[in-house]
Amino acid sequence: MMRTHEAGSLRAGHAGQSVTLAGWVARRRDHGGVIFIDLRDASGVAQVVFREGEMAERAHRLRSEFCLRITGEVVRRPEGNENPEIGTGDIEVTATELEVLSESAPLPFPLDEHLEVGEETRLRHRYLDLRRNGPAKAMRMRSEVNRIARDVLHGRDFVEVETPTMTRSTPEGARDFLIPARLQPGNWYALPQSPQLFKQLLMVGGLERYFQIARCYRDEDFRADRQPEFTQLDIEMSFVDQDDVIELGEEIISALWRETAGHEIPRPIQRMTYADAMARFGTDKPDLRFGLELTEMTEYFADTPFRVFRAPYVGAVVMPGGADQPRRQLDAWQDWAKQRGAKGLAYVLVGQDGTLSGPVAKNLSDGERDGLVKAVGAAPGDCVFFAAGDRSSSRALLGAARLEIGERCGLIDHDAWSFVWVVDAPMFESIDDTDDVAVGSGRWTAVHHPFTSPNADWVDNFESDPANALAWAYDIVCNGNEIGGGSIRIHRSDVQKRVFELLGISEEQAQDKFGFLLEAFKYGPPPHGGIAFGWDRICMLLAGADSLRDVIAFPKSGGGYDPLTGAPSPITVEQRKEAGVDAKPAAKVGDESISVFPPGVVEKQG
């Protein structure tokens, strides 16, 4: 046996026992010829003492991160030398045997938790970073999150199924990571962007309740909150409606927060329509930890003399106490808005006597000035920010301003948890209103994906008014972060055909890209729906981390680069030839590239 006890498990009750420990030297101190080391293993730290004589002599050569095996007697620390900060603070181990299992080179950075170390350096030596308490704790918490979810789902008779990670390239919005098929030169596998189509096939196969902690891959341009490979808790259920999926989602989320954060989520979690979220908060991911809301002012300024406010949409958001901001701070708000692609952020200052000032106020009519404070819910001393233009971008700007105001004014309780379901999402959006890759060649693209079912009010007539058609789609939001989302799927072939026609996807194109799914749907598919939770983001929130990278064992940095292994890296000419990278298959007639899943948060594919 390499060791008899874990270092962090020792307590006063072990006093008098002989123990053998194994771990790393976290700290070494020399006090008048007596050597003290903090021996660290996965369980914690124990203080080991090498008294004068041979043991102290042998301990002199020990350095940080030497890997040791030590035998000694557990004794209580002298009175006054206890350390209440650690679980083993009442005892120490007097060493009688020492074995150096391996030595350590000088460290590239100190492993002290209290010292700041650059992220690139930490990721390059991630194996050392994981010896620190914070990263190690995040990994253990993530393992616990997996266990909790599995317990909930197994308790409901769900079946954990592993779907392929080498599959056919199917259009799902982002680019695929491709793998050459060596035995079939010119042909390629793709790594899955999600298990979406396979989990629907499992429902056709009669499994009824499926889940998977799934690895997914998207070859996207770098974004700060994304990783090219990520994890989602993927779920699909047969014979369910939207309420059934939401109820299961709430049980999972409640169990996670209760068992890892000690927080009991009030249930049922409130619901808000997509339209309401956009109108009140300027986003479909509203942070409800504070109550500041947008006010639409389009009708109020319908006859305004101010040319800037003669726009399809005018909205406002109030900054409490913002009238006291100096001019340079108000100018900084303009720079803030321009960084988000806007021309600026109009504002009106409300004086303590109720008078309005600022560059916008003088351009308003007397009637507009007189009623403005009441219309937006402002008070003396407040600043009112405005955005005018198209509805989508103006709301987005005000929504971002709302969050910035919340931070600057201390309105957000960072110890609070606030959850909301956003439901009744639009089924389609015009290709003119999105930067996403168009779905098919029609005027409309799917907001979620083209297998999302229209809701009961729209299933028979969505073609008549695509702009207002609503889907059985739902996202769950925590503190302004989308942590999961899904939909009820189309299981009727006639409805699926009509959706494809509206999106401009021909029958030939549909068969070429995902004919295997359409073929399966000929054989009595059940009504089904599901959800996918963004596992990395959930773990980040539960760990109180600032970045997804903090809760991933070996994350990528900017642009998908791995500082640890140097991936991606070139391959040799021989590897390239053997893999058939340059082989060209015979072109198929009518083989057109269609994007079916718009780029976006992976949970939307759930």
From Swiss-Prot:
Enzyme superclass (EC): ligase
Name of this chain's protein: Aspartate--tRNA(Asp/Asn) ligase
GO BP terms: aspartyl-tRNA aminoacylation
Gene Ontology molecular function: aspartate-tRNA ligase activity; aspartate-tRNA(Asn) ligase activity; ATP binding; nucleic acid binding
Organism the protein comes from: Saccharopolyspora erythraea (strain ATCC 11635 / DSM 40517 / JCM 4748 / NBRC 13426 / NCIMB 8594 / NRRL 2338)
UniProt binding sites for ATP: R218, D219, E220, Q227, E482, G534, W535, D536, R537
Reported function: Aspartyl-tRNA synthetase with relaxed tRNA specificity since it is able to aspartylate not only its cognate tRNA(Asp) but also tRNA(Asn). Reaction proceeds in two steps: L-aspartate is first activated by ATP to form Asp-AMP and then transferred to the acceptor end of tRNA(Asp/Asn).
Keyword entries, A-Z: Aminoacyl-tRNA synthetase, ATP-binding, Cytoplasm, Ligase, Nucleotide-binding, Protein biosynthesis
Compartments in which it is found: Cytoplasm
Span list, region Aspartate: 196-199
Pfam families recorded: GAD (PF02938), tRNA-synt_2 (PF00152), tRNA_anti-codon (PF01336)
The keyword Transcription belongs to this UniProt entry's keyword annotation: no
Residues binding L-aspartate, per UniProt: E172, R218, H448, R489
Keyword hit for Lipid metabolism: no
Family stated for the protein in its record: Belongs to the class-II aminoacyl-tRNA synthetase family. Type 1 subfamily.
Sites annotated Important for tRNA non-discrimination: H31, G80
The reaction(s) this protein catalyses: tRNA(Asx) + L-aspartate + ATP = L-aspartyl-tRNA(Asx) + AMP + diphosphate
NCBIfam families, A to Z: aspS_bact, PRK00476.1
Superkingdom field: Bacteria
